[in-house]
A protein has these predicted regions:
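Alpha-helical membrane-protein topology signature
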Residues: 1-136
């Protein structure tokens, strides 16, 4: 029972944080998370979601929570693509889309390599590392 409560609390607090990030991004016409952190996070969410869907721990509750996280990550990603270009130096604005897609691909490759190389508990630690990077 305690694990269920902790999962619900963790899931709920991250959903609140992500929702605030999206709200602030739209309201301030900006984005609320460093982009490379977002790239790593969305990559981790997709890989972990795949694990949860394919019979990993957590059951239905974790599938629902992770699904919502993935959707909210997509919302933050949308705010980046809507408003991020204005923060690029003028000389680099023409590279915004290409460089952004490149970062997403690199983050997915990094997370996939980590995910396929290390045991499951190390993968969870990767999530904690991403949280640290997002907090900087």
């Amino acid at each position: 029972m305690m694990i269920l409560v902790l999962r619900l609390m963790c899931g709920g607090f991250w959903m609140i944080s992500y929702s605030i990030a999206i709200y602030k991004g739209i309201k301030e016409k900006s984005y609320a998370m460093p982009f490379f952190s977002l790239c790593l996070n969305i990559s981790w969410e997709m890989l972990y979601f795949k694990k949860v869907i394919n019979g990993g721990d957590g059951g239905l509750i974790w599938i629902i929570i992770d699904s919502i996280w993935l959707i909210l990550d997509a919302g933050i990603l949308i705010t980046y693509f809507l408003y991020g270009k204005k923060y690029y130096p003028d000389k680099l604005k023409k590279y915004f889309w290409g460089f952004s897609i490149f970062q997403l691909i690199i983050a997915m490759l990094i997370m996939n390599e980590f995910y396929t190389t290390y045991p499951f508990h190390a993968k969870i630690n990767a999530g904690f590392f991403i949280n640290i990077v997002m907090s900087m």
